[in-house]
């Protein structure tokens, strides 16, 4: 389990740097990406849920039950917002420490990626150039057929389709040839990158697994610290939810009791 956690964390951290390397944009820390996604998701759920609650309370049934769900919803939203403020710095510290501990490994992997990219770029450029040439050649062959169709009538449509079919097959076959050639050219570099990654991992295992065990221990320690620091915030959340749940339960029981009395009186 510890190995899985460490592996996912390393891939997550290196993945963000690899994206920055290929796209050449400003790097975003793992915590910033997680925080942005979580914030957007929570805000959408919160706003959408509040709209549904408001619609229900405005309905005839909602007015009759008078559960005060909207007040409880606002209280719950406030409690969740407080939790996010409390746990944010703790999670930030966790990512900072984990990123620091895996800095050397990430630098080595990024170096390998950069080297492979430089080697395969000429093949990618060549493939793109050949593909553009094939498309242009196909367009030149098809253009006269389109003019011929515009000059003719409906009976020439079938003739045009018969003429286009071999041209389309020719383009497909030529494209397949270029793709196969590109795959053959890139295969050695893919194998090389895979071997280098295996070498990096093997280096961690050498010496009785001391280096790998150190990574595991550090990741486990950071997770333990995060868990301990988050406990007070989670307890505050639980305490904040108790009044909300109790208020909802009381309102619901009162509504059920009122409905029962009305049914018995009829």
Curated annotation (Swiss-Prot):
This protein's UniProt keywords: Cholesterol metabolism, Glycoprotein, HDL, Lipid metabolism, Lipid transport, Lipoprotein, Oxidation, Palmitate, Phosphoprotein, Repeat, Secreted, Signal, Steroid metabolism, Sterol metabolism, Transport
Cleaved signal peptide residues: 1-18
What are its GO cellular component terms?
Answer: chylomicron; extracellular vesicle; high-density lipoprotein particle; low-density lipoprotein particle; very-low-density lipoprotein particle
Residue ranges for the region (10 X approximate tandem repeats) are 67-266
Give the GO molecular function terms. Answer: cholesterol transfer activity; phosphatidylcholine-sterol O-acyltransferase activator activity; phospholipid binding; protein homodimerization activity
**PTM:** Glycosylated. Palmitoylated.
Report the InterPro entries cross-referenced here.
Answer: ApoA_E (IPR000074), Apolipoprotein_A1/A4/E (IPR050163)
Top-level taxon of the source organism: Eukaryota
Cell compartment(s), UniProt: Secreted
- The answer to whether the entry has keyword Nucleotide-binding is no
Functional description taken from the UniProt entry: Participates in the reverse transport of cholesterol from tissues to the liver for excretion by promoting cholesterol efflux from tissues and by acting as a cofactor for the lecithin cholesterol acyltransferase (LCAT). As part of the SPAP complex, activates spermatozoa motility.
Family note: Belongs to the apolipoprotein A1/A4/E family.
Give the protein name, as stated in the record.
Answer: Apolipoprotein A-I
Originating organism: Odobenus rosmarus divergens (Pacific walrus)
């Amino acid at each position: 389990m510890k190995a899985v956690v460490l592996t996912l964390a390393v891939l997550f951290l290196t993945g963000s740097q690899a994206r920055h390397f290929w796209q050449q944009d400003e790097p975003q820390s793992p915590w910033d990406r997680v925080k942005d996604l979580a914030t957007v998701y929570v805000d959408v759920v919160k706003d959408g849920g509040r709209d549904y609650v408001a619609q229900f309370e405005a309905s005839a049934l909602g007015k009759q039950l008078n559960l005060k769900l909207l007040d409880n919803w606002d209280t719950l939203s406030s409690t969740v917002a407080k939790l996010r403020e409390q746990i944010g710095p703790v999670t930030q510290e966790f990512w900072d420490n984990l990123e620091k501990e895996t800095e050397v490994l990430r630098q080595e992997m990024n170096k390998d990626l950069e080297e492979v990219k430089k080697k395969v770029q000429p093949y990618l450029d060549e493939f793109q150039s050949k593909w553009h040439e094939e498309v242009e050649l196909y367009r030149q062959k098809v253009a006269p057929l389109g003019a011929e169709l515009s000059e003719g009538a409906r009976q020439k449509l079938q003739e045009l389709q018969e003429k286009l079919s071999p041209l389309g097959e020719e383009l497909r076959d030529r494209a397949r040839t270029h793709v196969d050639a590109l795959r053959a050219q890139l295969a050695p570099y893919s194998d090389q990158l895979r071997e280098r990654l295996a070498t990096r991992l093997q280096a961690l295992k050498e010496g009785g697994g001391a280096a790998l065990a150190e990574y595991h221990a550090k990741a486990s320690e950071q997770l333990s610290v995060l868990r301990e620091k988050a406990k007070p915030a989670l307890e505050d959340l639980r305490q904040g939810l108790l009044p909300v749940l109790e208020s909802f339960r009381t309102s619901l029981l009162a509504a059920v009791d009122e409905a029962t009395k009305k049914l018995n009186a009829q």
